[in-house]
Amino acid sequence: MSDLAQKFKDTVDYVQNADGDFEPSNELKLKMYALYKQATEGDVSGKKPGMMDFVGRAKYTAWEELKGMSADDAMQAYIDAIEELKS
């Protein structure tokens, strides 16, 4: 595993296990979701959720906007966003 991949994994673990009162905005949640999906799965795939599936459609659209971003760039952007929140 590369250093970047390990740091990404550590950052994801930190986010999933973080304690405290921090409640991220929906916008931040979507950004982090999209970066995670782009880093782990690549470009968006599958059918876009229907108009009445507001959450699913928002997630799909956020991920779709990252189309073409490399996994390494997505990992680094995810790490950078969390580091910025921690400071």
Question: Language-model features: where?
Answer:
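A charge-rich, low-complexity, intrinsically flexible signal that marks solvent-exposed coils, linkers
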Residues: 3-87
